[in-house]
Amino acid sequence: MNNSAFTFQTLHPDTIMDALFKQGIRVDSGLTPLNSYENRVYQFQDEERRRFVVKFYRPERWTADQILEEHQFALQLVNDEVPVAAPVAFNGQTLLNHQGFYFAVFPSVGGRQFEADNIDQMEAVGRYLGRMHQTGRKQLFIHRPTIGLNEYLIEPRKLFEDATLIPSGLKAAFLKATDELIAAVTAHWREDFTVLRLHGDCHAGNILWRDGPMFVDLDDARNGPAIQDLWMLLNGDKAQQRMQLETIIEAYEEFSEFDTAEIGLIEPLRAMRLVYYLAWLMRHWADPAFPKNFPWLTGEDYWLRQTATFIEQAKVLQEPPLQLTPMY
């Protein structure tokens, strides 16, 4: 079984209930699916009216060792008083197995959506990211990957070459735009940055607000530069992004040193995310959930827009990076 073709069709509600029951959890409510395409995630309430989330991992995306590293990082963060949703241990085990599925149970953490344009909230997030990275620097992931050009650009480019989803009449222009974007990223990429363990997918949708931030979903945790956990929080025009980044860095540096040279990686990382995300969609197209939720991927208009986006991002990479005020 490879994770590209896997569809979760055998993960029935009874299978989920049985898996939880074997861990001593009796579900007293329905299973409410949460928004996750990579894995299958459900919220529920047990007989004691405690609320939990159960995550069933997509087979073969991560190995058991890689998932356990994610769990270990989350538990270390909780121990260091960083607000993250960490897995619950059953008989000392956080990674569980049922009928060939790896799964984990988490406490359900409610909260409002993080307001990316709220400077007070941004400052608090920056402070906790500094603490998160303080923990992240204590050791590196051994089994989980490090952010790099091969995973984010080279492998997706090979996938695009053979893809049948790309309309034949638009494929040459799309591949040309992809190659130009890869060349632009490669020219501006650095590998002399300090590597640490990261959240990996730290955008506003993965932060809840309950009198402070709560970080969720460490599924994309990996090694990489600190800026990876900062840049996706920025929004608006360059002036707004500058103010937001300065707010984050000032709070961040209460706990961790930040290398401002990494700001030059923001646009390369943005380009890498654009390419990687598209490849992710295409790899999972055999899963019925993807054609259902992303039907536009088969339309010519989408590929025209995607080609234009790649061309524009290649141009952005030729511009000077975001500049902080002189005090930085």
Curated annotation (Swiss-Prot):
Top EC class, one word: transferase
Catalytic residues identified in the record: D201, D217
InterPro entries: Aminoglycoside_PTrfase, Kinase-like_dom_sf, SrkA/RdoA
Catalytic activity reported: L-seryl-[protein] + ATP = O-phospho-L-seryl-[protein] + ADP + H(+); L-threonyl-[protein] + ATP = O-phospho-L-threonyl-[protein] + ADP + H(+)
Cofactor: Mg(2+)
Gene induction: Expression is regulated by the CpxRA two-component regulatory system.
Places the protein is found: Cytoplasm
Site (ATP): S36
Name of one Pfam family that matches: APH
Main location: cytoplasm
Gene3D superfamilies listed in its UniProt record: 1.20.1270.170, 3.30.200.70, Transferase(Phosphotransferase) domain 1
GO molecular function: ATP binding; magnesium ion binding; protein serine kinase activity; protein serine/threonine kinase activity
One cellular-component annotation, GO: cytoplasm
Superkingdom to which the source organism belongs: Bacteria
Keyword annotations from UniProtKB, A to Z: ATP-binding, Cytoplasm, Kinase, Magnesium, Metal-binding, Nucleotide-binding, Phosphoprotein, Serine/threonine-protein kinase, Stress response, Transferase
Enzyme Commission numbers on file: 2.7.11.1
UniProt-annotated binding residues for Mg(2+): N206, D217
Family of this protein: Belongs to the SrkA/RdoA protein kinase family.
Function description: A protein kinase that phosphorylates Ser and Thr residues. Probably acts to suppress the effects of stress linked to accumulation of reactive oxygen species. Probably involved in the extracytoplasmic stress response. Also has a role in LPS synthesis, through regulation of the galETK expression. A protein kinase that phosphorylates Ser and Thr residues. Probably acts to suppress the effects of stress linked to accumulation of reactive oxygen species. Probably involved in the extracytoplasmic stress response.
Quaternary structure and interacting proteins, as annotated: Monomer.
Protein name as catalogued: Stress response kinase A
